[in-house]
Amino acid sequence: FRSHKLPVDAFIFDFEWYTTTPDYTVAREGKEGYSDFNFNPKLFPHPAKQIADLKAAGVKFIGIRKPRLGNNLLLNTARKNGWLSHPDSDSRDLNFSSAKLRQWFENKTKPMLQAGVDAWWDDEGESYYTCYYWWNTAQYHLLNDVRPNYRHFTINRAFSPGNQRFGYCTWNGDIQSSWASLADVPKDLLNFSLAGMYYGACDIGGFHGTPEKETLVRWFQAGVFFPIMRAHSDLGTTARFPFLWGEDGEAAMRKALELRYQLLPYTYSLAHEAYNT
C-alpha cells in the first residue's frame, strides 16, 4: 500500500489470525487443541512485535471474533457453568448476558489486547437478540481496563438499541459483487442511520464473487462518503486491493481514497456530533 501511495489505516484480519482452520464443522463437544484465544503461530509467531511493526507504519490491527467456542476443554467449562446461550442444542454460542461469563471472557481476551490488538470485528452473533449488546459490553469494559480513555471500536453484522454507545459499526453482511448490491448499499446505510446506528459500512466490492473492474472502482468512489470505508471479500475471489486491478483501476481507486482523506475533517466532525447528540 505504501509503495503504491495508497492510504491505509487498519488491517482487519479474518479467522486466520487466531486459528489455522474455521470452526464451522466443529462438533457440539468441541475440538481438542482448537485455538480460541491465541494467535495463530504460523502467521504471528511474534505477535507483539509484529503488531508493533504495523503500528510503526501507521496501521492498526483489528481481529475477527466469533461468539462461540471451538476448544473442547473451554466448551466443557462453559457448559458446566451454564454459559451457553442454547445449552440443549448443538450451538456453541456463549450467553454474554451472564456477568460471570463476561468476566471469564474478558480474562481470556485480555492477552490479545495486551499484545496490541486495537479493535474487534464481531461476526455471526445473531443467535439471540441481545448477543451483540452484551458481547460489546464485555469488550468495552475490558478495553477501558487495559487502555483507559482509548476509543473503543467494533464492526458487527447486526445491532440492537443501545449499541451506539460503544463506538459500534454495523456492516450490511455478505453481499454480492454486483451493480444491484452496490445500488442497495446507500439505502441500507440510511436505514441503519434512521434506526440510530450512524456508523454503517459494507464490503467494498461486495463479498461473494469477483466484481467487474468498473463496479469496484464505482464502489470505491461511493465508499468515499460512507461512514466507514472497508474493503473485504470471500476466499477464492480477487482481493479488493487497488494494485491488483491494473494501472487504470488503481489510479481511479487511489483518487477516491485521496478524496476520502481530504474529507476526514468533515466526516470526523459529523462523527463527533453524532456521538454527543
Across the structure, where does each feature detected by a protein language model lie?
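Catalytic-domain carbohydrate-binding cleft regions of carbohydrate-active enzymes
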Residues: R2-T277
